[in-house]
Structure formats: C-alpha cells, structure tokens
Amino acid sequence: MRAQPLSRAAIVAAARRIADTEGLAALTLRRVAAELDTGQASLYRHIADRRELLALLNEDLARAFPVPGPGPARERLIAQWLGAHRVMLDHPWAAQVINEPTSVTATSLPFAEAAIAAFLEAGLDEAAAAHAYRATWHLLIGQIVNDHPLGHPGFTVDPAIYPALTATRPHLSHLDFVAEFEWSLNQLLNGILGPE
C-alpha cells in the first residue's frame, strides 16, 4: 500500500529514482506507477504524458543547480559551475533531459541569471557575457555527454603513425571527471576573463 498520497512531487521523486538507478530509457509512466504502487491511469490526474514528466524532471533538476552568494565574480563562477557539474554527475540522465525542447524552465533562470551577472560583474559587456555563459554551458554538457576516456581496452595505437596519441595515452585513458572539468573550467575562464 502507498505510504504517501499521489502528487506531482511524489511522481517526480519516483521518476528521478528510476532515472538515477535504471536510466532514462527505463523511465515510463508504467514504471513510475509500479514504483508508486498505483495504476498508470492514476498518474494522468497529475501529469499529461511522458513528455510532461521529463519537463517536470528537468524543473526538479534545475532547482538543484547552485546559485552562489556574495563574493568575487570569478570565485562565484567557479563554485557555481563546479556545483552544476556535481549535480550532473549525480544524475547521468540530466544532459539528455536538458537537451529536450522543453528544457528552459522558470527554475533554470536563477542559475542563468547568477552566471551572467557574474560575467558582467567581471567586466564583460552584454554580448560577451552571453557568449561566455553559452561557452561554459557547452563545456559542462560536453564533458558530461563525452564521459568515456580515449583508450578503450583492446584498442591499439601504432606509435609510428600516432606519436602524440601514444605519448599522451596514459593521460587520455584515465579520466577524473571532477579534476578534468575543474581544469577545463579554469582554462576557459582564463581565456574569457584573463588569467587570475
């Protein structure tokens, strides 16, 4: 028997658990209903379809993105984007949901506002701040989506043909996602804002 009444919040929480543990492909209304020990038809009182469920899941995800408090603009940007990266790593399905057409939600606006405000405060004009926001966002999504290291087991590289790949392969085949993102973020900010 269900422990709590059925609500949008309960449906989204169940959807997040399923997506986190089983993947986005497993996220169906039937699966959510089973998780909540209810019939699929009862979900339709709260959500229209899977598309709306994904939009609600995206809203829930955006609420978890950090909006840092006061401090120097560059420090706020680093904290904000590293925090967003942690949220994305915790939810492997996030990049796919964010790429849906319904991904811009009211809950995502505080994150965008804080980042763009920090870029403006750091001295960028409006156009450059918009470009900087997009570039940083693309860095985040790109690193999350491309989560495999170069150098899969069994893959060989001829050192005579690919000397640079051979020399860097130990570094390419091991990937610490957090350290890699932090390094990339700092390099990007150095390019946009100038070195510290």
Question: What residue spans do the PLM features occupy?
Answer:
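Hydrophobic alpha-helical connector segments
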Residues: P66-S108, Y133-T136
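Alpha-helical structural segments
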Residues: A9-R17, T21-E22, E52-P68, P72, ...
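Amphipathic alpha-helical packing segments from all-alpha helical-bundle domains
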Residues: A79-Q80, N99-A135, I141, F155-P163
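C-terminal peripheral helix-coil segments that are non-catalytic and often amphipathic
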Residues: E121, P149-E196
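Residues in the recognition helix of alpha-helical DNA-binding motifs
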Residues: H46-I47, A132
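Basic, helix-initiating cap at the start of DNA-binding domains
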Residues: M1-T38, I47-A55, A179
